[in-house]
């Protein structure tokens, strides 16, 4: 039986992952004391902000990097199933927050939007068709459509077909159940709900600057008020570091062994933003292409409709932009300060192993707006320079670590959970699809670090997430019932299986 004594939890950062974790903890243990510290003046300013990411509800409907071609030409869709299930889990939790009154007006943060995959060239068309055949035979994706007909593509994505002829070899697949998610608005809603909780204290313009672990295992957390300069020490049984790009430096300050042999490589995302309403109104889908050969998953180009502040907009990217800051609002010394005697060999090994990635990043940095526009024209041939502006979005810090399987300096893509041996310190590192799978990440944190509470928490988690403990991949009936319910809760369109 778990110790029912009230615990003190310090949460660092007010992005989507931290507010998701905080939202769960306040329902699982209402008597626990939650202190959430954000160094900026409001929640969701960094990578969670709607202007700092593409807002894709990552469900593996159109993202081709989740479906891998095997040597025999077949397509492995196992990762796509996993990503889709994780997004369905997120939708269940968001629906619960709406039904329980913790947040309101789901259309403020999630909107239905078809997801399309688009490719050109004989080999890519063959890949997409094989992917379609593999996915349409699996219940999660059985509403997928496929075409090589330009006239059908004109119906799906008219903007992208302007100026094209039927002579070009190309193909597209479409799933109508896709979404656009305003993670910034979702974060703000969850943060506001936490602020109202009687045992929560949310402080903005407060920065965690250091840690000290007492002999009794309690953490002393030093927090600086960025307005007054005052420093206070708060006590914590658990420290949750969800500070985005700032997580690695904070993890290093804890001094836990798990923070060693770990580093980060900061990369910004840049997007072309459309400023012409006539162009914006011609495109009402998310269209993902295929990453160029030999480049990492972050290079997948996409042309996205977005819903921001109740208005439609249009963006294309991403283009990488490297720099020393770990956060948009960070310091040019972030990268250099993160280099320690215990991780310098890890970072150097990574540089040697990942020369193609470094070359790609440098090429991207040197790319002008003209170069970005040329990339856009592979999607939208008639794009005009005057209709688009180049915008630098959020930071991602690629995790670099030593592993038994890959040796020194392995670059980890996706979201990584790091915790101390005694589970008192938990840090979330990495990037996409973090926001879309934030609920599954929070559940992983709970399962790995709060095992003694499993018996008490399982019924509560099943109330929040009805499929908790079950498989939406294996249980088709449950998957369909879950989708139908979350579509109702979140005011989304529901499509019966074909």
Curated annotation (Swiss-Prot):
Catalytic activity: (S)-malate + a quinone = a quinol + oxaloacetate
Protein name, as recorded: Probable malate:quinone oxidoreductase 2
Cofactor: FAD
GO biological process: tricarboxylic acid cycle
Keywords linked to the UniProt accession: FAD, Flavoprotein, Oxidoreductase, Tricarboxylic acid cycle
Coiled coil: none
Pfam families: Mqo (PF06039)
EC main group: oxidoreductase
EC code(s) of this entry: 1.1.5.4
Pathway(s) where this gene product acts: Carbohydrate metabolism; tricarboxylic acid cycle; oxaloacetate from (S)-malate (quinone route): step 1/1
Stated family: Belongs to the MQO family.
Single GO term (MF): L-malate dehydrogenase (quinone) activity
């Amino acid at each position: 039986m778990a110790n029912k004594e009230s615990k003190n939890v310090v949460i660092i950062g007010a992005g989507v992952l931290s507010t998701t974790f905080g939202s769960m903890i306040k329902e699982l243990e209402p008597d626990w004391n939650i202190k959430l510290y954000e160094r900026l003046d409001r929640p969701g300013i960094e990578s969670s902000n709607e202007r700092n990411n593409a807002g894709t509800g990552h469900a593996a409907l159109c993202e081709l990097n989740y479906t891998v071609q095997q040597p025999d030409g077949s397509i492995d869709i196992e990762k796509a199933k996993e990503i889709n299930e994780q997004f369905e889990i997120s939708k269940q939790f968001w629906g619960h927050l709406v039904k329980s009154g913790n947040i309101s007006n789901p259309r403020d943060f999630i909107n239905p939007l078809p997801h399309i995959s688009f490719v050109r060239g004989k080999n890519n068309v063959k890949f997409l068709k094989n992917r379609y055949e593999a996915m349409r035979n699996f219940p999660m994706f059985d509403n997928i459509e496929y075409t090589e007909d330009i006239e059908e593509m004109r119906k799906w994505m008219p903007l992208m077909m302007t100026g094209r002829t039927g002579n070009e070899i190309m193909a597209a697949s479409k799933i109508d159940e896709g979404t656009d998610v305003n993670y910034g608005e979702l974060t703000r809603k969850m943060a506001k709900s936490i602020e109202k909780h009687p045992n929560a204290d949310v402080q903005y313009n407060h920065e965690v600057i250091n840690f000290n672990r007492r002999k009794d295992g309690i953490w002393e957390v030093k927090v600086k008020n960025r307005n007054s300069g005052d420093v206070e020490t708060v006590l914590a049984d658990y420290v949750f570091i969800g500070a985005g790009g700032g997580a690695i430096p904070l993890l290093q300050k804890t001094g836990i062994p798990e923070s060693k042999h770990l580093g980060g490589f900061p990369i910004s995302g840049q997007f072309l933003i459309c400023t012409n309403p006539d162009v914006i109104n011609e495109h009402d889908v998310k269209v993902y292409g295929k990453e160029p050969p030999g480049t990492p998953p972050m290079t997948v180009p996409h042309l996205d409709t977005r819903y921001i502040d109740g208005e439609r907009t249009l963006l294309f990217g991403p283009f990488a932009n490297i720099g020393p800051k770990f956060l948009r609002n960070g310091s040019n010394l972030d990268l250099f300060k993160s280099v320690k005697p215990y991780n310098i060999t890890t970072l150097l090994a990574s540089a040697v192993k990942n020369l193609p990635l470094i070359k790609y990043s440098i090429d991207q940095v040197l790319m002008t707006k003209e170069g970005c526009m040329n990339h856009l024209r592979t999607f939208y041939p008639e794009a005009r320079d005057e209709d688009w502006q180049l915008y630098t979005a959020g930071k991602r810090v690629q995790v670099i670590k030593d592993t038994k399987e890959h040796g020194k300096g392995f670059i980890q893509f996706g979201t990584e959970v790091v915790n101390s041996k005694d589970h008192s310190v938990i840090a979330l590192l990495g990037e996409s699809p973090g926001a879309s799978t934030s609920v599954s990440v929070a559940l992983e944190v709970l399962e790995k670090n709060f095992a003694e509470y499993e018996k008490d928490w399982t019924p509560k988690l099943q109330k929040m997430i009805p499929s908790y403990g079950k498989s939406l991949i294996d249980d088709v009936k449950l998957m369909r019932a879950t989708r139908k319910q979350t579509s109702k809760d979140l005011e989304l369109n529901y499509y019966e299986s074909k």
